[in-house]
A protein has these predicted regions:
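ATP-dependent adenylate-handling active sites, centered on carboxylate activation for C-N bond formation
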Residues: 1-139, 153-165, 178-214
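Conserved S-adenosyl-L-methionine
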Residues: 141-151
Length: 214
């Protein structure tokens, strides 16, 4: 069901879509619309790979802009399609135009900071989204504000459930590598669409408001 609504066999996209699916299903029992946090990592340097830019603020700012411009093809695709698959409307307040403009005016050195791991206001030697965490320090519990970054599928625990399911589909007792995982997803997608090659041919080609020829 996740792959059907996602219309993608991308490994990372599918992995993150699974906890989104369960969260959307639970939320839809009670509400018709939810607020999500998409955009915060792209605006305030929230990904662990950003650590490589901690001493290169100009390059970090450029990378944040690049990832923000690519969101429609990754995280926003996941959130929009999976939530609508449960008839739930997801709204993204971090992507309000005025907030984007304000966030991009904040120096990159305040978003990703070198910190003392023993400090109460740190997640380690490098702290992501520092200024955003600081701004919310009086609004949310300390342990929540300063918890270490975890990918959605890891933090939710669905990555372990998925590993077991993939092993069953692959007919093995051991771990399934990324290439096998991708093939499993492509097989599931192919089984659900008459002409899946049309999806594969154009997946990921939306860029800068145009469709590139596959």
């Amino acid at each position: 069901k996740v792959i059907y609504h996602l219309e993608s066999a991308d490994v990372d996209l599918v992995r993150s879509a699974i906890p989104t699916h369960f969260a959307a299903r639970l939320a839809r029992r009670h509400v018709k619309a939810v607020l999500t946090g998409e955009g915060a990592d792209e605006l305030f340097a929230g990904y662990t790979y950003h650590h490589a830019y901690v001493d290169r603020p100009r390059e970090l700012a450029e990378e944040l802009t690049r990832s923000l411009n690519a969101m429609h093809n990754i995280n926003l695709q996941r959130v929009d399609r999976i939530t609508m698959g449960e008839s739930l409307e997801a709204r993204t307040p971090f992507l309000d135009r005025d907030l984007i403009d304000f966030a991009q005016s904040i120096p990159a050195t305040l978003k990703l900071c070198r910190t003392d791991p023993s400090d109460r206001e740190a997640t380690g030697a490098t702290t992501e989204k520092w200024i955003l965490r600081k701004a919310c320090a009086d609004l949310l519990p300390h342990d929540l504000i300063w918890r270490k970054k975890a990918q959605f599928d890891e933090g939710s625990g669905t990555i372990d459930m998925l590993a077991q399911a993939l092993a069953g589909l692959a007919g093995t007792n051991g771990p399934v590598d990324r290439a096998q995982e991708s093939e499993i997803y492509r097989g599931i997608l192919s089984a659900q669409y008459r002409n899946p090659e049309r999806i594969f041919a154009h997946a990921g080609t939306w860029e800068a408001g145009r469709v590139e020829a596959a």
